[in-house]
């Protein structure tokens, strides 16, 4: 009996019954955005960081960010050291 229900259900779905039809034809559906709408080429920041609002003290996260030269040294250090000795090397590097 279950097999007959499965056969009927498959035949209705494959036959394109009224229940399987779309509520709106595909030609009536419009997209509200283009493919590149909202894409920006500029740098995005998730924080509100304005020079007017700055009080002179920076966040701890921003204060301790390394500059480009220090990041290049860190990348070179990571490239030359093995994974087991990298932890102590990073501690020594960041403590300077």
Curated annotation (Swiss-Prot):
Keywords: Host cytoplasm, Host nucleus, Secreted, Signal, Virulence. The keyword Signal applies. It is found in: Secreted; Host nucleus; Host cytoplasm. Its main location: secreted. Residues 27-59 are annotated as: Disordered. GO terms for cellular component: extracellular region; host cell cytoplasm; host cell nucleus. Induction: Expression is induced during host plant infection. Residues 46-55 have a biased composition (Basic and acidic residues). A motif (RxLR-dEER) lies at residues 44-59. Residues 1-19 form the signal peptide. The keyword Secreted applies. Belongs to the RxLR effector family. Effector that enhances P.infestans colonization of Nicotiana benthamiana leaves. The RxLR-dEER motif acts to carry the protein into the host cell cytoplasm through binding to cell surface phosphatidylinositol-3-phosphate. This is RxLR effector protein PITG_11507. It comes from Phytophthora infestans (strain T30-4) (Potato late blight agent).
């Amino acid at each position: 009996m279950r097999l007959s229900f499965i056969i009927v259900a498959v035949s209705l779905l494959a036959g394109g019954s009224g229940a399987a039809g779309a509520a709106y034809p595909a030609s009536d559906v419009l997209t509200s955005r283009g493919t590149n709408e909202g894409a920006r080429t500029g740098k995005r920041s998730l924080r509100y960081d304005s020079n007017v609002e700055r009080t002179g003290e920076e966040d701890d996260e921003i204060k301790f960010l390394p500059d480009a030269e220090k990041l290049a040294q860190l990348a070179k250090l990571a490239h030359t050291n093995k994974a087991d000795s990298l932890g102590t090397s990073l501690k020594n590097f960041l403590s300077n």
